A protein has these predicted regions:
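Transmembrane helix-loop-helix hairpins at membrane boundaries of multipass inner-membrane proteins
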Residues: 1-13, 30-125, 197-218, 222, ...
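Hard-cation-handling environments
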Residues: 463-530
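Alpha-helical transmembrane segments and their helix-start/interface "positive-inside/aromatic belt" motifs
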Residues: 36-49, 175-185, 376-385, 467-481, ...
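Membrane-entry segments of alpha-helical transmembrane domains in multi-pass membrane proteins
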Residues: 5-19, 35-43, 81-98, 136-149, ...
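Aromatic-capped, Gly/Pro-kinked transmembrane alpha-helices
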Residues: 494-515, 536-636
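Alpha-helical transmembrane segments and their membrane-interface junctions
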Residues: 390-406, 480-499, 570, 576-577
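Hydrophobic transmembrane alpha-helices and their helix-loop junctions in integral membrane proteins
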Residues: 105-146, 155-465, 489
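N-terminal signal-anchor/start-transfer transmembrane helix
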Residues: 17-32, 104, 233
């Protein structure tokens, strides 16, 4: 249904919640940037109101029957009509709440983490810009509006990743993220263009309807679905566009929590879910997506097994879990994919924010060094990070256990068992690399007595040691830990909320395979046990089985040489082709044109040189001949 915003408090709340962060961004950049504390207050207040609006909308419309829309004319050209506005349904209400909630907690945490940073006000301005773009994208009624704010999310992410722009590595990481996600966005745009030209409409509800099959052939739907999925691959770091995400750790740690939990990188998965019925109309495309998600999940898991950087471990785990979400959706398990996105938002934000406390206190990203300097002495962060790692590993009764089991159940419904076995292998690897990190901090080989904050921060330019703000950073951890503990028990209400109104979303199937639950948990516990043997028990070498195999360790540490392949491709194919093209153009067109003009001028001069013989009689004859011709022209 369509309503006017001033008559409907629902749409008023939607507009207020989405637009306030933009107002905050403008106020900070134009007026309050010289006043850091005031800027932070404005930003936190704005996102607080956004969270209140999102929660009120979710509660008010928990039993929503039909999507609520408010639209106005945006683009009108001939038969083309593109509206701009808001659409509220079960999926957008849930995602809006997640984005607002994580944004609020990250901004509160940042009051302690970023205190004293020279770019404090600028940081909160970019946080507000990001929140506005993400929330407005979430409730977009058309894919064109979705795409516009999708690009704004990418721009805001670039600003946040490259926040420490004076550092070369941070600047390069921001550019890499921006360029690699643009590659996927080009395919996304071409896919939307294909739908628009053949279907004539980019309204999300219309794209998800059965009518599209009458206007587009199966081949066209498959092609457009694959192209649109390019955007998912770029934003959600799916193979082969996955290597930018670990480098995005160059931004401040709270930024990592924001990007990796429920916002930028989850935007791709959200888009997959947003037009899930459209994608489902092409079984071929869904099989391709399933393969991409599986490859991504396994590759990222292996990369996480050898790194010593605490933020990179969780970055690789993000890529892997996004692969799990894509697998769930591509297997037809609409609810399982969204449920894992929801639970992942909580425990992944918790993992990064806990890591930020360790980095803040010890000035290093190396988790072996954190353990060596007494990381287990920080009681709240160590308890919370262990809890979140257990949720990431899929251990009961934490939220990650329930959502992973839903995905495994969906994979078990597929006729080919290879997808399920790949998922189970991923569960084992996830538990192993997660507790490799936990045990390295809890049970270091040696301990140095170091007072908190004694180290100079050399990780990502984050030298902010303000012990008095410890509890400002700790409260968001406690809230997220509570969410991680209880969220899984709300699986049934959430499933009724989402799937009860979503056609074709069945098939998560977790309850039909009791044996699968035991196998999955058993494999996760096996991963924890292996990590304990290698890193936790007394006298452990703290060298993993992969690290003992030097060629394999190098392969994983070099990220399967994917970046090297891209560099070779750029240097020898792209640069080579264009270099030869421009060289040939320079030599044959530009040089040839100039040289040809010179030769023509010289040749013409030689041809006319007989006119300048140097004889007076000849010159007089030519002069009189010209005068005679002029006279004939004028008089006759």
């Amino acid at each position: 249904m369509t309503s006017s915003w001033f008559q409907d408090p629902t749409l008023l709340a939607a507009m207020l919640g989405a637009l306030l962060p933009f107002v905050s961004f403008v106020l900070i950049m134009v007026f309050t940037r010289p006043y850091p504390k005031l800027s932070a207050t404005i930003s936190v207040a704005a996102v607080s109101v956004s969270l209140i609006c999102a929660l009120s909308l979710l509660g008010r419309h928990w039993h929503l029957e039909q999507p609520i829309q408010y639209t106005a004319k945006w683009l009108v050209s001939g038969k083309l009509y593109v509206p701009f506005g808001f659409m509220l349904d079960q999926l957008s209400l849930l995602m809006l709440t997640i984005v607002a909630g994580i944004s609020f907690l990250v901004q509160v945490y940042s009051l302690g983490y970023m205190a004293g940073d020279p770019g404090f006000a600028r940081y909160y301005a970019f946080q507000s810009l990001f929140a506005w773009a993400m929330m407005t994208m979430t409730i977009a009624p058309t894919m064109l509006q979705f795409y516009v704010f999708w690009e704004l999310v990418g721009l805001a992410s670039y600003f946040l990743i490259g926040f420490y722009y004076e550092k070369f590595s941070a600047s390069e990481a921001g550019k890499k993220a921006f360029v690699m996600t643009r590659l996927g966005d080009i395919a996304f745009f071409l896919g939307l263009l294909l739908v628009l030209l053949n279907f004539g409409n980019l309204n999300i509800l219309d794209m998800n309807s059965v009518d599209i099959t009458a206007r587009m052939s199966p081949a066209l739907i498959t092609l457009s679905a694959i192209l649109i999925f390019g955007g998912v691959a770029g934003k959600s770091a799916q193979f082969p566009l996955l290597t930018w995400l670990p480098d995005a750790m160059e931004g401040p740690t709270p930024v990592s929590a924001l990007l990796h939990s429920a916002t930028m990188v989850a935007a791709g998965v959200y888009m997959f879910a947003r037009i899930f019925p459209f994608f489902s109309k092409s079984p071929t495309a869904m099989t391709i997506f399933l393969a991409i998600g599986t490859i991504t999940m396994l590759l990222a898991s292996t990369m996480a097994m050898v790194t010593r950087d605490i933020k990179q471990v969780w970055a690789f785990s993000t890529i892997s879990q996004l692969g799990f979400m894509v697998m769930g959706l591509a297997a037809g398990s609409y609810f399982a994919g969204i449920f894992h996105l929801t639970t992942h938002a909580g425990f992944k934000a918790l993992l990064f924010l806990c890591s930020g406390v360790f980095i803040h206190e010890y000035g290093t990203n190396d988790f072996f060094e954190i353990g060596k300097h007494g990381g287990r002495g920080l009681k709240v962060p160590i308890v919370c990070i262990t809890l979140a790692a257990a949720a990431l590993s899929g251990l009961p009764p934490l939220s990650g256990f329930f959502s992973k089991e839903a995905i495994m159940g969906g994979l078990a419904e597929l006729p080919n068992p290879i997808w399920l076995w790949a998922g189970l292998l991923g569960a084992f690897l996830t538990a192993y690399y997660s507790f490799r990190l936990i045990f390295a901090i809890l049970f270091p080989k040696e301990i140095e007595e170091v007072h908190h904050g004694e180290h100079g921060g050399h990780g990502h330019g984050e030298d902010h040691h303000h012990a008095g703000l410890y509890w400002v950073m700790a409260w968001p951890l406690i809230i997220l830990a509570a969410v991680t503990l209880v969220l899984g028990f709300f699986q049934t209400p959430l499933e009724n909320f989402l799937v009860g109104h979503h056609g074709g979303a069945e098939g998560h199937g977790g309850g039909h395979h009791a044996w699968l639950l035991y196998v999955a948990v058993g494999l996760a516990l096996s991963g924890v046990a292996l990590a304990w043997l290698e890193f936790g028990r007394k006298g452990a070498s703290q060298v993993g089985f992969v690290e003992r195999l030097e060629p394999v360790k190098t392969l994983f540490a070099e990220r399967w040489y994917i970046d090297h392949f891209y560099r070779l491709f750029l240097d020898y194919v792209i640069y080579g082709i264009f270099s030869n093209l421009f060289t040939r153009n320079d030599r044959q067109v530009i040089d040839g044109g100039i040289d040809g003009l010179c030769r023509a001028t010289v040749g013409g001069g030689r041809m006319l040189s007989f006119l300048q013989s140097g004889m007076l009689q000849y010159n007089l004859m030519v002069m009189f001949a010209v005068l005679a011709l002029v006279a004939l022209y004028f008089f006759f």
